[in-house]
């Protein structure tokens, strides 16, 4: 429930007075990014409130040139509700929500980096691998936060590098809970109301196959994709998304499924018994028959991809602190398991030899790293948080919800 600040000098029950406004508490430094939800600004605390903050302003629904105050989107409500309740060092947490002039502002601690930004940095001006200890720390913290979400009965449903935030002290925060959803005893299948979840490159095969009763395993597949991308500096399954038609029918993502099959092999009922009952199984069969015999590998080529990745990245192919090694491949293969019932869980992943055998894991993923990552771009253009225009497009290279970070409001576990 959203609460405006009441004047303590006025008895309760007599109405709202002396509301705290965003600019009363925060100095707006500049504009960061925008998206379909609205805009994000960087701010500093005022009146003794120390720290840097990211303020996310939701835009009202608009019809033509007339603004219609018809309420908040389902995504915004979910994000506010969940962020207000969750409490974990590796999950985004909310500082406060401010209601001002029919606009909603979510205030978060400012985070300086995200994984998309870090990966991009390692491709410029030439490709240079992310250090193996950093990858290990990032993955451990990510799985630690994900375990908390899953034990709290929350599916994230949109894990991708842009939504994995990193503080200047190297702490990982899982951000953007706009698609997150509770999954215990659902009244309806999780498919209802949300026909498309998870950005296409990180979408689990059961989602591509039309599953309506998916599980936390969808998040673990996305973690596998992120792990692979940290090592290779490019998305492992970079397909092209087929858009919905005019009837809002969700199409079979043929190209994305092809990208997965090219590395993981053609899924069969022997390795994934439940696939034969999937709504899109006939489409998969059609895809397989549309290619010449032998076009798609019958078995996984993930290990070959992994070894090539280590070689190209300059990682040692043996074991040791300077390489993900054989343990890294084993964990990756368990994360990228076709059958969601066999896919490794967050708890199991945290206990995997990849983390157990490589020595201590730093809570600061930057520990030992001598380089520096660039700061976020903050502009003075259109930085009026109250009257700023609200375009529906986002800044190039600055993903939606890329600034979510840790905050102080807590609910004890």
Swiss-Prot record:
Q: Name one Pfam family in it.
A: Pkinase
Per UniProt, what is one GO molecular function of this protein? RNA polymerase II CTD heptapeptide repeat kinase activity
Q: What is its main location?
A: nucleus
- PROSITE patterns, per this entry? PROTEIN_KINASE_DOM (PS50011), PROTEIN_KINASE_ST (PS00108)
SUPFAM superfamilies per UniProt = Protein kinase-like (PK-like) (SSF56112)
Where are the annotated segments for Disordered? 376-413
Record-listed ATP binding positions: 32-40, 56
The cysteines covalently paired via disulfide bonds are none
User: Per the record, what are the reactions this protein catalyses?
Assistant: L-seryl-[protein] + ATP = O-phospho-L-seryl-[protein] + ADP + H(+); L-threonyl-[protein] + ATP = O-phospho-L-threonyl-[protein] + ADP + H(+); [DNA-directed RNA polymerase] + ATP = phospho-[DNA-directed RNA polymerase] + ADP + H(+)
Task: Name the coenzymes or cofactors required.
Answer: Mg(2+)
- What is this enzyme's EC? 2.7.11.22, 2.7.11.23
List the active-site residues: 158 (proton acceptor)
Q: What are the UniProt keywords, alphabetically?
A: Activator, ATP-binding, Kinase, Magnesium, Metal-binding, Nucleotide-binding, Nucleus, Repressor, Serine/threonine-protein kinase, Transcription, Transcription regulation, Transferase
GO biological process terms, alphabetically, are: negative regulation of filamentous growth; negative regulation of transcription by RNA polymerase II; nuclear-transcribed mRNA catabolic process, non-stop decay; positive regulation of transcription by RNA polymerase II; protein destabilization
GO CC annotations? CKM complex; mediator complex
Q: Keyword Transferase: yes or no?
A: yes
Q: How does it assemble?
A: Component of the srb8-11 complex, a regulatory module of the Mediator complex.
Task of the protein: Component of the srb8-11 complex. The srb8-11 complex is a regulatory module of the Mediator complex which is itself involved in regulation of basal and activated RNA polymerase II-dependent transcription. The srb8-11 complex may be involved in the transcriptional repression of a subset of genes regulated by Mediator. It may inhibit the association of the Mediator complex with RNA polymerase II to form the holoenzyme complex. The srb8-11 complex phosphorylates the C-terminal domain (CTD) of the largest subunit of RNA polymerase II.
Belongs to which family? Belongs to the protein kinase superfamily. CMGC Ser/Thr protein kinase family. CDC2/CDKX subfamily.
Q: What is this protein called?
A: Serine/threonine-protein kinase SSN3
Query: Can you name the source organism?
Result: Aspergillus oryzae (strain ATCC 42149 / RIB 40)
